[in-house]
């Protein structure tokens, strides 16, 4: 019963129809009334103006099965699609809505009844969350519904971010928002994961199936929370998730709709392994792409069309991975129409257009895909490290039409990180500072082919004689170079470390009688080490012998930072858990950057614990022991492997006491005590499930501490105290400021009351009604509401329109006494004026607000208000 997705959709809509809800068709994926949205991404989007009080429907209860796309802007799930059980670019959101009708108790009861009585889900498999301060919702669940208190979990805000909570819903930076309660389903203890709010909450055992939002506020661009005209309800339940539960499967990709699409894609392409993730990507993407085209979006290089192009091309590439040799994607449209049933009415009507658009884009992409993938493949094969530089990513995008997320997808399969920041500014220095310092393009490594080999002696020596075996100028092999040339010098043996494993290449000089070559970077070119730099004196030929001198100070500082990354890795695994693995690193003389897998921001207390643990190991002054052994033996000893690195049968193992053991080809200190001091300077997220720590060591750490101390002392001086009293004095100042703000508000209220008494005398009488139209000077926009309320009380039967022009903006408020709303509506009045000052607005019949961007037109606009009101009062 209700096991197919179509049956679930029908059951949901029928349940709410029978409970007084109007069944409303899904709106377009292109929002028609909201410039802040790229695509429709929630069921409530089409009702946004209703929630804001700017629109009114003939019903106060509604239910929908809304088509949604999340693949751009704030809500962007594209990177995870196909690789997780529940991420999609397209999904259907089942929802029920109350526009000032029922509120918390009925909303909760409807959800619980549908799940436990209609779908007959076991109550013991369900638990719920509420916003930390929402005692009302907690009591309803506990006292009215009968959910045990231990199965009601309070979820608070993220640290330092008010309202940034899984249980405080907000559509975007602005718009309707409010606390919410969520219902979770327990898939069973055979699946890893914990209850919401627990450290294991990101696991797949407990899955959110229904979110019930209590819409109470309208968030302004300033961050101010304005009460909505009437508290309302917005709920959402992804049909794919509930279908998975009803069909007895864990992954959304195993439900009937996806099974059919995956089977058809496999048939068209000619593959038999239905578990391949590429088939999941294709099955998901055909839904978003087909419905977007049906709703009028076409592939292009900007806006919505660009997002569509990205999704199509990602699907096509996955088809090519599976062996597709001709256009296949558009052939899935008939199957999609069949499995979507009633939800595909609009798609069926536009089937021919949809198929043509998808086929044309697929064929266009095929003409550039092969060449672009070849270039990307070459770049990745030549990559020294675990990060693809932004210049290469930009070249692929700019020259071959590759979206950055498609490049990221290819890199992900090879455990390579994409330098997205570097892509945005089209520069290569995000991966290596030395590449930016030289005059070589970011793809120089890919272009330069060196067959020679270079032996490395730099573990034990920082100087040594070597013979020049090759010279490269502007990417071409030459026999000699002259003073002033920027070139690459290849030696038979070198103490210079070539960039690898996150450690930057060494700098230094190559010298002989009358010859000096300044090395700005050292890179690997196959089995050779290329010394990149400038010949500053003399001339240099192949076959000459030079003395190679590594910059000892820079190498030493780099070694401090490299060795401490091993300690940091081990400390993170101890503090956060063994799920932590290295995802990338950058080690240079100035700092270290360490990327690692973790599902949430590292808490300040955890960071402190990690830092203390690392410094403890530094003080213990462990000897670093290095040993060569078979890779299997190293793994048996528990050695951690570096993310993305390729290893030979024999590997180098670096051990620090009983605290850390890793495979590593880099250079290190002799003892951990050489590091001196370790200080974390920042922690943040760089991708889904990947965090980044930046830190300093040695003298740089001491300088950082000194800077922090200096800032503390400066703050103490400003507060007229010592460093021990800074916190207490700052708290006292903040308390004083709050009191002053409170006193100021009270004064403003008194001034508003006084001003209202003066303003009331300016009212004119029209057909027995007090009419006040006034442009105010020196009044803050935030005071308009209170002033309008005061005036309505004084003037009794009245129509009021107040305007303020300040800082290039106009703020308007209209008020109409209840006895007059049948003749004059505040929303219509304020909208009329707003239209003349470059804005729009609306609200209730008795009170409405608006804004505008043309203060120079305010006087003219106000001059038209009295005739407008007089006409309606006649």
Swiss-Prot record:
One of its GO terms (biological process) is alanyl-tRNA aminoacylation. It catalyses: tRNA(Ala) + L-alanine + ATP = L-alanyl-tRNA(Ala) + AMP + diphosphate. InterPro entries: aa-tRNA-synth_II/BPL/LPL (IPR045864), Ala-tRNA-lgiase_IIc (IPR002318), Ala-tRNA-ligase_IIc_anticod-bd (IPR018162), Ala-tRNA-synth_IIc_core (IPR018165), Ala-tRNA-synth_IIc_N (IPR018164), Ala-tRNA_ligase (IPR050058), Ala_tRNA_ligase_euk/bac (IPR023033), DHHA1_dom (IPR003156). The keyword Zinc applies. Transmembrane segments: none annotated. SUPFAM superfamilies: Class II aaRS and biotin synthetases, Putative anticodon-binding domain of alanyl-tRNA synthetase (AlaRS), ThrRS/AlaRS common domain, Translation proteins. Its cofactor is Zn(2+). Keywords: Aminoacyl-tRNA synthetase, ATP-binding, Cytoplasm, Ligase, Metal-binding, Nucleotide-binding, Protein biosynthesis, RNA-binding, tRNA-binding, Zinc. GO terms for molecular function: alanine-tRNA ligase activity; aminoacyl-tRNA deacylase activity; ATP binding; tRNA binding; zinc ion binding. Binds 1 zinc ion per subunit. CDD domains: AlaRS_core (cd00673). Zn(2+) binds at residues 562, 566, 664, 668. Pfam families: DHHA1 (PF02272), tRNA-synt_2c (PF01411), tRNA_SAD (PF07973). The keyword RNA-binding applies. Its EC number is 6.1.1.7. GO terms for cellular component: cytosol. NCBIfam families: alaS (TIGR00344). Catalyzes the attachment of alanine to tRNA(Ala) in a two-step reaction: alanine is first activated by ATP to form Ala-AMP and then transferred to the acceptor end of tRNA(Ala). Also edits incorrectly charged Ser-tRNA(Ala) and Gly-tRNA(Ala) via its editing domain. Consists of three domains; the N-terminal catalytic domain, the editing domain and the C-terminal C-Ala domain. The editing domain removes incorrectly charged amino acids, while the C-Ala domain, along with tRNA(Ala), serves as a bridge to cooperatively bring together the editing and aminoacylation centers thus stimulating deacylation of misacylated tRNAs. This is Alanine--tRNA ligase. The lineage of its organism: Bacteria, Pseudomonadati, Pseudomonadota, Gammaproteobacteria, Alteromonadales. The gene is alaS.
């Amino acid at each position: 019963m209700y096991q197919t997705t179509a049956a679930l959709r029908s059951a949901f809509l029928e349940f709410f129809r029978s409970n007084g809800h109007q069944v409303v068709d899904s709106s377009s994926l292109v929002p028609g009334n909201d410039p802040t949205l790229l695509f429709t991404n929630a069921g409530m989007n089409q009702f946004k103006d209703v929630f804001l009080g700017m629109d009114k429907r003939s019903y106060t209860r509604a239910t929908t099965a809304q088509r949604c796309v999340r693949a751009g802007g704030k809500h962007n799930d594209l990177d995870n699609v196909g690789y997780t059980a529940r991420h999609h670019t397209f999904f259907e959101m089942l929802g029920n809505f109350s526009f000032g009708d029922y509120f918390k108790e009925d909303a909760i009861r409807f959800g619980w009844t549908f799940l436990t009585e209609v779908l007959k889900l076991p109550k013991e498999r369900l638990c719920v969350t509420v916003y930390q301060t929402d005692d009302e919702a907690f009591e309803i669940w506990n006292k009215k519904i009968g959910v045990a208190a231990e199965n009601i979990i309070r979820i608070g805000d993220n640290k330092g971010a008010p309202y940034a909570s899984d249980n405080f819903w907000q559509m975007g930076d602005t718009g309707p928002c409010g606390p919410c309660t969520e219902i979770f389903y327990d898939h069973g203890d055979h699946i890893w994961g914990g209850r919401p709010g627990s450290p294991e909450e990101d696991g797949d055992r407990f899955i959110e199936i229904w979110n019930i939002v209590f819409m109470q506020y309208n968030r302004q661009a300033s961050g101010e929370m304005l009460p909505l005209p009437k508290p309302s309800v917005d709920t959402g339940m992804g049909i794919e998730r509930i279908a998975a539960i009803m069909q007895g499967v864990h992954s959304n990709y195993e439900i009937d709709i996806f099974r059919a699409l995956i089977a058809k894609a496999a048939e068209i392409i000619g593959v038999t392994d239905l578990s391949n993730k590429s088939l999941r990507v294709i099955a998901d993407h055909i839904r978003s792409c087909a419905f977007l085209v049906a709703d009028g979006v076409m592939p292009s290089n900007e806006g919505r069309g660009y997002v569509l192009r990205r999704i199509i091309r990602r699907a096509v590439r996955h088809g090519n991975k599976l062996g597709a040799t001709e256009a296949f994607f558009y052939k899935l449209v008939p199957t999609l129409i069949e499995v979507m049933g009633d939800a595909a009415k609009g798609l069926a009507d536009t089937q021919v257009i949809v198929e043509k658009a998808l086929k044309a884009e697929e064929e266009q992409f095929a003409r550039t895909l092969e060449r672009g993938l070849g270039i990307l493949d070459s770049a990745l094969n030549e990559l020294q490290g675990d990060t693809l530089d932004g210049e290469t990513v930009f070249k692929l995008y700019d020259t071959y039409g590759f979206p950055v997320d498609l490049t990221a997808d290819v890199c992900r399969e090879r455990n390579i990180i994409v330098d997205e920041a570097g892509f945005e500014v089209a520069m290569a220095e995000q991966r290596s500072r030395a590449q930016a310092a030289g005059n070589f393009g970011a793809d120089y490594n890919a272009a330069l082919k060196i067959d020679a080999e270079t032996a490395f002696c730099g573990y034990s020596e920082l100087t040594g004689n070597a013979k020049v075996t090759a010279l490269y100028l502007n990417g071409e092999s030459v026999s000699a170079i002259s003073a002033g040339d920027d070139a690459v010098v290849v030696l038979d043996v070198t103490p210079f470390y070539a960039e690898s494993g996150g450690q930057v290449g060494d700098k230094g000089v190559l010298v002989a009688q009358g010859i000096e070559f300044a090395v700005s970077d050292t890179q690997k070119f196959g089995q050779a080490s290329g010394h990149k730099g400038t010949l500053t004196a003399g001339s240099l030929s192949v076959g000459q012998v030079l003395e190679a001198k590594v910059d000892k100070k820079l190498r030493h500082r780099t070694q401090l930072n490299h060795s401490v990354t091993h300690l940091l890795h081990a400390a993170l695994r101890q503090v956060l858990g063994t799920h932590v693995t290295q995802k990338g690193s950058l080690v240079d003389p100035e700092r270290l950057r360490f990327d690692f897998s973790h599902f949430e921001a590292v808490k300040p207390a955890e960071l402190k614990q990690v830092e203390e643990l690392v410094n403890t190991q530094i003080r213990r002054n462990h000897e670093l022991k290095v040993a060569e052994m078979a890779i299997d033996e190293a793994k048996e000893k528990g050695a951690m492997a570096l993310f993305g690195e390729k290893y030979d049968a024999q590997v180098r193992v670096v051990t620090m006491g009983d605290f850390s053991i890793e495979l590593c080809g880099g250079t290190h200190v002799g003892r951990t005590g050489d590091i001196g001091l370790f200080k974390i300077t920042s922690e943040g997220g760089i991708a889904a499930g990947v965090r980044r720590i930046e830190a300093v060591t040695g003298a740089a750490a001491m300088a950082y501490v000194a800077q922090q101390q200096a800032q503390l002392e400066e703050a103490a001086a400003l507060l007229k105290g010592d460093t021990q009293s800074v916190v207490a004095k700052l708290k006292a100042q903040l308390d004083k400021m709050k009191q002053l703000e409170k006193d100021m508000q009270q004064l403003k209220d008194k001034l508003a009351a006084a001003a209202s008494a003066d303003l009331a005398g300016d009212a004119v009488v029209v057909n027995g009604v007090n009419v006040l139209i006034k442009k105010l000077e020196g009044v803050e926009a935030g005071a308009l509401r209170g002033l309008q309320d005061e005036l309505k009380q004084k003037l009794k039967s009245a129509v009021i329109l107040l305007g303020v022009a300040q800082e290039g903006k106009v703020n308007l408020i209209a008020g109409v006494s209840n006895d007059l709303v049948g003749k004059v509506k505040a929303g219509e009045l304020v909208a009329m004026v707003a239209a003349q000052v470059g804005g729009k607005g609306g609200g209730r019949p008795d009170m409405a607000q608006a804004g505008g961007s043309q203060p120079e037109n305010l006087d003219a606009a106000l001059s038209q208000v009295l005739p407008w009101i007089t006409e309606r009062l006649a």
